[in-house]
Amino acid sequence: MKAAVLREANTPLEIEEVSISKPGPREVLVRPVAAGVCHSDLHFMDGSYPYALPTILGHESAGIVEEVGSDVTYVKKGDHVITCLSAFCGHCDQCITGHLSLCASPEVGRMPEEAPRLHKGDETIHQFLNLSSFAELMLIHEHALVKIREDMPMDRAALIGCSTTTGVGAVFHTAGVEPGSNVAVIGCGGVGLAAINGAAIAGAGMIIAVDMVDSKLELAKSLGATHTIDAGQCDAVGEVKELTQGGCHYTFEAIGLKATTEQAWQMLRPGGAATVIGMIPVGTMVELHGVDFLAEKKIQGSNMGSNRFRVDMPRFVDFYLNGKLHLDQMISKHIKLSEVNEALAALKTGQDARHVIMFDQ
Amino acid sequence: MAKVEIPSEVTGNVWKITASVGDTLAADDVIMILESMKMEIPVEAPEAGRLVELLVRVEDGVEEDQVVAVIET
């Protein structure tokens, strides 16, 4: 099969012929139909997050089941599915206590003594986040996918596989935004826009979008932002405090920077909660003014929207099909696998919402 | 000769050890792969040297900044 392989950080992905194993007892072979190109892929491509190489990037996809392992009963050949990196074992402490997205069990991948899922001759190709969706086939654990209804367009479904779940989930699950509360979202990429859409669905009062790109702020308005702030033109913290007369109940950082994480904290009203969704580079420290804790401010991380994706994703599909979740505007371009490097380069400019790879069927 | 301690950058588990004590390593050679929040994160030699100590075993948990290996340069 063809796949986009990362062999060295900060070099383009190479389209190569790669081999994929047959499904083990609890594995599923999926033929992706669509795969989103996400900013998180860029973090690994540019080395700000190290990863075992060579690897096939990509982690936001929807496809059709091609073959199932001998013990798999949840899906069958032909089922439409969304894949998710939050593969869960189902029996560790985190899973049993309801925190499936924090499952760290290695059993959803293959162990070092087993044949790798992906290889090129004798060379192991490391699977990215147990998925590797920039490829014509994916071999994944049965707990890394969810069945969806077949009237859901696959390119939209792919977005639910990561950015939608991460942004909407951060609002619904991690933060628990209440109707009427004021929300600010810093960063209007795919995840930030999903958080804005999620805040609108949750019934937030004021929804303030903060970014430095006009087109993204316009997009944010169409997804539910009630106010926009161009952080390149003003003091964003001061603007938020003035608009909300003292700060937000909830803020979301969706970029992954020290400065914007600290701004998310500063934008809070007493008792408010900041949720950091963005992937802050390894080794970066964040500074908070200690006295602010007297005001009962809270700060927390959110990984993949604290999801329970087997429940969440079908609901998000319904939200899209009944008009609440606006995914059409999120896709700026459909591309081929061979154009993935151009899509990653476009992400660096911050101009486009999302490129989606469409595979030939 | 100087000994260089190699810390883990993240909290996670040792998934695979790819080098052995006594191996001669070039800078950036992978010594082990950690698994942390679904990611396979390599621990690499920061400079060329000989691997003189491995301080963890497969499946061990490691903390951020914990020294996991030592090389002699």
Segments from the language model and where they lie:
Chain A
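Glycine-rich cofactor phosphate-binding loops and adjacent beta1-alpha1 units
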Residues: 175-179, 191, 201-202, 212, ...
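Mid-domain Rossmann-like dinucleotide-binding core that forms the NAD(H)/NADP(H) cofactor-binding site
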Residues: 136, 143-145, 149-234, 238-239
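Residues in the short beta-alpha loop(s) of Rossmann-like NAD(P)-binding domains
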Residues: 9, 213, 280, 305
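C-terminal hydrophobic helical "lid"/dimerization subdomain
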Residues: 246, 250, 262-266, 310-361
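Rossmann-fold dehydrogenase core element
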Residues: 272-273, 287-329
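Residues located in well-ordered beta-strands
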Residues: 2-4, 14-19, 31, 62-64, ...
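Cysteine-cluster motifs in flexible loop/terminal segments that predominantly coordinate metals
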Residues: 85-143
